[in-house]
Amino acid sequence: MLANMKSFLQAIINVSEKAANIARACRREVQLFRLLVQEKSNEEKNQRFVQDFKTLADVLIQETVKHELGSKFPELIGFIQGEESNVFTNTLGETIEVKIMASQEDTAELLSKVLDGDRSAADLLALEVHRDVIIDSDIPQELNDTNNLLPMDTIGIWIDPIDSTAEYIQGTECSPDSHDIYVCGLRCVTVLIGAYNRKSGEPMIGVVNQPFFLENGDSWRGTFYWGVSCEGTVRNSFSAPPSPTSTVVLSGSETDALKENLAKHFELVEAAGAGYKLLSVARGLADIYILSRGSTFRHL
């Protein structure tokens, strides 16, 4: 089956925003936030939860993306993957597979089992999962042309539901540096959804959603970016190509020797989140993202 490139991209953007809504809800709603902040060391966290709530937030976003895209594009079922296992064991020893049910009520019922009967938290999560989300996007009309059709039986999806989880949990606030790059905090958190050719591994479409882009009183507003490079079409949501900045963005865990060598030629900015660092390069805030360790990988 062939799918319209514009409608496929719009579907990914919509579900990225639903994922962002879930991420924001987990920090905004008191009942959910109490669970979220329990992610500490094994000794400190509430032993009532066998798997921490942070992991459930990750998994719920991942399964929501899988459900939404699989429902709209059945050819993708079985080829939408993420980094989290969706199997949980509650304190009663029950093994539960987290998945999105047909109704909000059924999803809440399943989630309450994972959360050891905390129905209030389960209801709040299920509400966001089943909420209709359609976000305005400035996708060029040319992606709606009949020559921009995608063979869905060749496409795979990879999801990183909450990138920079530590910053998401801690929820600290940082000021941007002179290049407008945030080195830590909620602004480094991203939801990453990518479509790729599952035969060659070549990336085709990517969406990066920043759930915590702009603080607005007691709430947050997000933003998103997209890019397309497939079937001879190359487009993205950036208004202009980036200009050189002589800046390298990297993780603070890189070796001192590497940093010393780079500092001879570039200004270094240590920032959280692999997705956020890549986004900083795409936005032209930095020239290069350097990663010398095996903590981040390309999925094939």
Where are these regions (language model features)?
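An extended, acidic
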Residues: 3-6, 12, 19, 212-215, ...
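N-terminal subdomain of lithium-sensitive/metallo-dependent phosphomonoesterases centered on the IMPase/IPPase/PAP
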Residues: 1-162, 178-182, 200
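DPxDG-like acidic metal-binding loop motif
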Residues: 148-228
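Conserved residues at the C-terminal ends of beta-strands
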Residues: 83, 209, 292
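Short amphipathic alpha-helical segments and helix-helix/interface helices
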Residues: 66, 70, 145-147, 192-193, ...
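Short loop/turn segments at secondary-structure transitions that flank enzyme active sites
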Residues: 29, 86-88, 165, 197, ...
